Amino acid sequence: MLDWNPALYRRYEDERTRPAQELLARVPLPEAARVVDLGCGPGNSTELLANRFPTAKVVGTDNSEAMLASARERLPQARFELSDIATWAPQDQAPDLIYANAALQWVPDHEQLIPRLFAALAPGGVLAIQMPDNREEPTHRLMRAVAAEAPWAEPIGNADRLRTLLLPLGGYYDLLAPAAARVDVWHTIYQHPMADAAAIVEWVRGTGLKPFVDRLPADLQASYLAEYERRVDQAYPVRTDGKRLLAFPRMFIVAQKKA
């Protein structure tokens, strides 16, 4: 997959930052010395963490050079590192908070990943995770449906496999509960008013649609996006104010390690 586009991602930054704020609000730590923001993107979540824990050493990690450049421009005083979550491990002392907002859905093998991240915490530390749970929403079902048709099917191939199939929420609880002092899990469906079908397509182009479009040559990108937008227009009815409501389910997990 090509590198991420921070400018495209930030077009809906307020909507993307809201679940990050709500995840952080449920972190049961009055203070923290070491905080890691896994998959920090353009630094919007890292900024929240730095404001919540002003005396902490906050480190943002991402596997995208473009996202890290955007994050460094936003927070020049913060520390950012190029890193793959699948192989990440603390470089020195164990962190008090490992925070991953809208990142782990791109990382495979959650049955091994989640316990490994939890084990990396300091005693009493917290693992906080938010992941989009929208694979069966019309936006994502239509991505796959159009991608399965000619002339797009052959170049797109198995792009959908780049995103991990999430466990049921109870599955994450079961992974963490035996070693945790407390586990808090919940599910929220946001309803985002969008101007039109084109705005919905623009939103998902910054994330979930990217692996599909990246595999297409320029001429097929245009036709794929046009057909996808046509179907999105049919799937999301116009509301009384002329807008569309984009339902966006998200999964939240906050687990605290025993002291």
From Swiss-Prot:
Reported EC number(s) for this entry are: 2.1.1.144
Taxonomic classification: Bacteria, Pseudomonadati, Pseudomonadota, Betaproteobacteria, Burkholderiales
The record's NCBIfam families line, in alphabetical order, gives: PRK01683.1
Q: Which UniProt keywords apply?
A: Cytoplasm, Methyltransferase, S-adenosyl-L-methionine, Transferase
- What GO molecular function annotations does the UniProt record carry, in alphabetical order? trans-aconitate 2-methyltransferase activity
Q: Where in the cell is it found?
A: Cytoplasm
Q: Which organism is it from?
A: Variovorax paradoxus (strain S110)
Q: Which InterPro entries match?
A: Methyltransf_25 (IPR041698), SAM-dependent_MTases_sf (IPR029063), Trans-aconitate_MeTrfase (IPR023506), Trans_acon_MeTrfase_C (IPR023149)
* Gene Ontology CC terms, in alphabetical order: cytoplasm
Q: Which GO terms describe its biological process?
A: methylation
Query: What protein family does this chain belong to?
Result: Belongs to the methyltransferase superfamily. Tam family.
| EC class (word) | transferase
The task this protein performs is described as: Catalyzes the S-adenosylmethionine monomethyl esterification of trans-aconitate.
Q: Which reaction does it catalyse?
A: trans-aconitate + S-adenosyl-L-methionine = (E)-3-(methoxycarbonyl)pent-2-enedioate + S-adenosyl-L-homocysteine
Keyword Translocase (UniProt): no
- Its main subcellular localisation, reduced to a broad class, is cytoplasm
Gene expressing this chain:
tam
The name under which this protein is listed is Trans-aconitate 2-methyltransferase
Instruction: Write down a Pfam family by its short name.
Output: Methyltransf_25
